[in-house]
């Protein structure tokens, strides 16, 4: 069974707690679908090409239909010509948004956290706060976790803690409403404040 590592106030291992049963046996396809939708919804969709009807010019037939020995043509803006429109090119009007229902989103997060638990990379701590506001103090916390990159979930982020974590390239500080399966799976370790963790378990 997957377990979360409980840390003391010095961010050292104090004990372990088993993850709830409803975190177990979830189909990993839920995570795939959520990650796919999350990435699609981030898509900027800026690529756009003009079709033959949108390119300026080309209203006149360039040469007579018959008698030249060459192929017939109705417009110099045909995709066959240099300077012509693009056939089947990308359009910025296309909608790439994908929807994921609430239950599936929930199961994806539970699966991602369960995976972190199996890897020994899910940590629970009573409070995450850097009162000094110094980056070196936040870096010391991350170093104690011992992972290449860390997702830190804190309720009501104060300014000092925000400033301390802001410049760390290997740590990402978020509030509970920002936590999702994509982020939980992307980082090597996840550190969650106890009140946030209890809320996650209760909502499951």
Curated annotation (Swiss-Prot):
GO terms for biological process: translation. Keywords: Ribonucleoprotein, Ribosomal protein, RNA-binding, rRNA-binding. Belongs to the universal ribosomal protein uL4 family. GO terms for molecular function: rRNA binding; structural constituent of ribosome. Residues 48-73 are annotated as: Disordered. This is Large ribosomal subunit protein uL4. The keyword Ion transport does not apply. One of the primary rRNA binding proteins, this protein initially binds near the 5'-end of the 23S rRNA. It is important during the early stages of 50S assembly. It makes multiple contacts with different domains of the 23S rRNA in the assembled 50S subunit and ribosome. The lineage of its organism: Bacteria, Pseudomonadati, Campylobacterota, Epsilonproteobacteria, Nautiliales. The gene is rplD. PANTHER family: 50S RIBOSOMAL PROTEIN L4 (PTHR10746), LARGE RIBOSOMAL SUBUNIT PROTEIN UL4M (PTHR10746:SF6). One of its GO terms (cellular component) is ribosome. HAMAP family: Ribosomal_uL4_B (MF_01328_B). Pfam families: Ribosomal_L4. Part of the 50S ribosomal subunit. SUPFAM superfamilies: Ribosomal protein L4. The keyword NAD does not apply. It comes from Nitratiruptor sp. (strain SB155-2).
């Amino acid at each position: 069974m997957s377990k979360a590592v409980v840390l003391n106030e010095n961010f050292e291992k104090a004990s372990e707690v088993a993850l709830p049963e409803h975190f177990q046996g979830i189909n990993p396809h839920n995570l795939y679908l959520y990650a796919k939708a999350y990435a699609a919804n981030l898509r900027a969709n800026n690529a756009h090409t003009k079709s033959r009807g949108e390119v300026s010019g080309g209203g006149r037939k360039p040469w007579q239909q018959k008698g030249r020995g060459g192929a017939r043509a109705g417009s110099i803006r045909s995709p066959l010509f240099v300077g012509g429109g693009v056939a089947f090119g990308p359009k910025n009007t296309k909608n790439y948004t994908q929807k994921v229902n609430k239950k599936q989103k929930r199961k994806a997060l539970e699966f991602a956290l369960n995976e972190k638990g199996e890897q020994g990379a899910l940590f629970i701590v009573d409070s995450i706060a850097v009162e000094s506001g110094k980056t070196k103090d936040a870096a010391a916390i991350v170093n104690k976790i011992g992972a290449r990159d860390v997702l830190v979930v804190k309720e009501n982020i104060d300014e000092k803690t925000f400033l301390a974590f802001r410049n760390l390239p290997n740590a990402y500080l978020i509030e509970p409403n920002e936590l999702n399966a994509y982020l939980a799976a992307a980082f090597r370790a996840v550190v969650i404040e106890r009140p946030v963790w209890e809320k996650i378990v209760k909502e499951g």
